[in-house]
Amino acid sequence: IKEYKLTTELYKKMIMSFCDAYKVINPVIMGCSMGGRVVLHLALEQSNFFKAVISLEGSDKLDAYYDLDWLHRPDVHGGEVQAAFVSSQIAPQSPEKFKHETLWHYMQGGPGIFKGDLYFYWHDGDFDDRSSLINTKDCPVYLLSGEYDCSCTPERTEATAKRIKGSKATIIPGIGHFPMSENPDLFKRYINPILEEISDL
């Protein structure tokens, strides 16, 4: 069986195929983590299609910081290892029930899927050499990052925002890498004003 690796082109194609199938008009797209990265690609390449993009815990470049081979081995439970790796990215004060639910999602992935997704997230999706070409007048860009995110750190988000002229970056206190799932009530306080701003565009 061929090893699964999510590429930038495949990821963008899946999203645009969905939009085409449902014939969406003037959509706003929001993604988190690897989704936060791919929406920045779409802001660059599909600026006339999307009304705005919202990148949660997203940046235009990341560096790998743990060994991916642990995620797909016959002697290791991949789901439990995946949850262990990402558990450090959740803010300590996030509600326990939401922490567990977030980690439970990571325990459900099929063999090799998370490892293959990280190929895009850590390697193929980097485009810090081109992100400055995003035209935020055509497609406004909003970046939000949690202060407890040790993967896409606030510093990485802010560095990306500096490269994307006209983008708006917000660092959310008391939240980690999974704002919408680890602490939805806190997240709503920050995302709702942005949605209202976009609705007025």
Regions found by a protein language model. Give the residues of each.
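Active-site loop/oxyanion-hole signature of alpha/beta-hydrolase fold enzymes
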Residues: 1-30, 189
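Gly/Ala-rich beta-loop-alpha elbow adjacent to hydrolase catalytic centers
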Residues: 31, 35, 39
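Flexible "cap/lid" loop of the alpha/beta hydrolase fold
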Residues: 40-80
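Conserved alpha/beta-hydrolase catalytic His-Asp/Glu region
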Residues: 64-65, 76-135
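Short beta-strand/loop motif that positions the catalytic acidic residue
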Residues: 137, 143-145
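Acidic catalytic loop of the alpha/beta-hydrolase fold
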Residues: 147-152
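Short alpha-helix in the alpha/beta-hydrolase fold that links the catalytic acid
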Residues: 153-162
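Catalytic active-site module of serine/aspartate enzymes centered on a nucleophile-bearing elbow/loop
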Residues: 167-201
